[in-house]
Amino acid sequence: MKTHLKFKNTNIGIVFTLLLTAVIADGCTSNKKQITFSEHIAPIIHKNCTSCHRPGEAGPFDLISFNDVRKKAKTILKVTQSGLMPPWPADTSYQRYIGERYLTQVEKQLIFDWVDAGCPEGPPGPEAPVFPAGSQLGVPDVIIKMEEPYLIQGDNKDRFMVIKIPYELERDTFLKFVEFVPGNRRLSHHVNGHIIQYSINDKQNIFEGPRVVNREDVGTLDSCYRFLKLLNDDGTYPLLTPSVFNYLPGVTPQIYPSGVGGYRIKKKGAILMRDIHYGPTPKNATDQSYVNLFFDSVPPKRPFMETQLGTLGISEIVPPLLIPPDTIMKFVTKAIIYNDISLVTINPHMHLLGKSFLAYVITPSGDTIPLVRIKEWDFRWQYFYTFRNMMRIPGGSVIFAEGVFDNTVNNPNNPFSPPREITGLGGSMRTTDEMFQLILTFLPYQQGDENISLENVTPQMKGIQ
């Protein structure tokens, strides 16, 4: 049976209809919770943005308080909806890593709705995160600091430098961790650090030679070593322990479980920042960065090993890395893994013509193991991606890397206009030349490695509770 409401008085019908509409509208509004800064937006900003966007850091403005964020609301909306910020080039639908910084669609929608509603503040709170002023790991045993501040010219140009800091310890020792602390956090954009080690009679004066050289001035790695006088006295290369630290703004140093990693080092050596990128500045500035060494009382049980595919690595690039002007080209490199390994970290590397990067493993059984996919290469953000658990790669597997390079006028990062032929054949360190590398940090596989989590490891150090 249907019930029909009829109104003899038109005015009564209109009033009833308006009241009914108001009730329905009010019901919808009450069910939709207001998006506020303190409840919804602050946790997103503090987790993904504040570590860089705070006083003295690399971000161009602060994003800490409600007023900070409200003033930049339109900018935040634009860069988050486009995916430009927070910077995380790797495709998280392809592989997952520790320390990911990206926004989910739900978080992007919250930001959109908040800005659209006029940026309401909401109730007081939450408290802004607290960041340690110096070490994030504890009290170091030794601090190795640049002897003199390095002058960064105020000419609005990026600089890619190589810096050495020689040192002499009391004796040969073991290291648990190495931590880089930038002296100028606003301009220090990324650093890849290594340790050069000298045996007692290999080099009499480890303190000779210049401390700094511009990568653009030396070209090859060999020229760099010779200019900085890093070679042994007989002209041979010293022992290099690679990738003992890596730095990007806002990135927390990676801590590994007990028994994993660590280093043996000689008493005489040098910290080699083989790739330190200073961002542009309109005014002269200085940097006097330092490195914290944390000793260990026992030798490392499972020190990391490193290899690289492609440029200066164990595998050839096909076709040879030569990119004619006005072309978009794909290059491939591959290498066989002969024994089972536990893969820990990967680092894709290209220069300014890079367009996309893909790396994966094909196992002997024909399975594919995804490593990393970067759909839109960004030279400014070259992470060392650490897997959440060690990744077992069976012996007999083949690791593939595919890189696409764009040497056209449509590439906004192309260093030349009009485009020129760009080569990567000589292993040049100049950013205007090219490289195509995949760097792997790994261990020989042990039973159960794939079950070892690399997340949320608490360092057992002095000064850490």
At which residue positions do the language-model features occur?
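Bacterial Sec-dependent N-terminal signal peptides
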Residues: 1-35
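Aromatic- and Gly/Pro-enriched helix-to-coil junctions and flexible linker segments
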Residues: 28-165, 177, 269-275
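A surface-exposed loop-and-adjacent beta-strand signature within N-terminal beta-sandwich domains
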Residues: 70, 74-75, 83-98, 190-257
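Short acidic/polar inter-strand loop motif in beta-rich domains
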Residues: 118-122, 279-283, 404-413
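Solvent-exposed, flexible loop/coil segments flanking beta-strands in beta-rich domains
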Residues: 127-196, 283-353, 413-465
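Noncatalytic modules at the cell exterior or secretory-pathway interfaces
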Residues: 175-176, 263-278, 391-406
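Beta-strand-rich globular domains of non-transmembrane regions
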Residues: 225-297
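Extended, compositionally biased non-globular segments
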Residues: 336, 344-430
